[in-house]
Amino acid sequence: MLERIGGARRCFRLSQKPAHSNGTSPPTRTEPGLLTSTARTDPQVLGWLKRRLGRDRTARKLYGSIVTQARRPAFYAAWGVPDTPQGRFEMVVLHLALVVRRLTREGADGQRLARALNEHFIVDMDDTMREMTFGDLRVPREIKQVTAALLDRHKAYSEALAEPQASKLQEAITAQLHYLGDSGQFDMVGLADYMRRAASALDPVPGARLLDGNLDWPQPDGGTAS
């Protein structure tokens, strides 16, 4: 499945220079005309819609930050991750898993935002596949597999980060990246160390700042890149 994600060009293309800090993200799908005239004036409905739109905007902001960080050259040049659609996919999902892990600690609001962020990723993948002219019957099957891969990685990385042994995270990363090539080409120690530093950088971010879409990423080679 992942070997066939060759069209993740819009979000996963690795630029030769560091991406801009604001990142890029696809437009949100809108469904005009879904609300009846009564619903448009109902305070509860309007309140729900306002919260949903705000959450979607925040998810787009977070996703842009994730993609920007995942495109940093060090992952590919220094640590051996292939500079291919599949390699970039894995780096985006790795960072997505870190953010979702942190969001789920922020109660109901954080869990809803984590869900919106995952949905934003899936919509982006769906759009990308359709741009590749995948058939309408094929796209749902591919998206089902992408969703399963996403959830598997969320679980594997979260469980490994909870273990004190550094080897557990290295093993989890190896298990997810093995299909990209000979595991000997990857610097698993460097990747695992970065992932722990990234988790440590996200942990102290105040909940209000996080729920407003602000992330603090470490530089792959040290320092901090917001």
Describe each PLM feature range.
Residues 1-6, 110:
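Short intrinsically disordered, low-complexity coil segments enriched in acidic
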Residues 2, 14, 34-35:
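Leucine-biased recognition of intrinsically disordered, low-complexity hydrophobic segments
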Residues 6-7, 23, 33:
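Residue-identity detector for glycine
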Residues 35-226:
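Surface/interface-facing alpha-helical segments and adjacent flexible terminal/loop regions used
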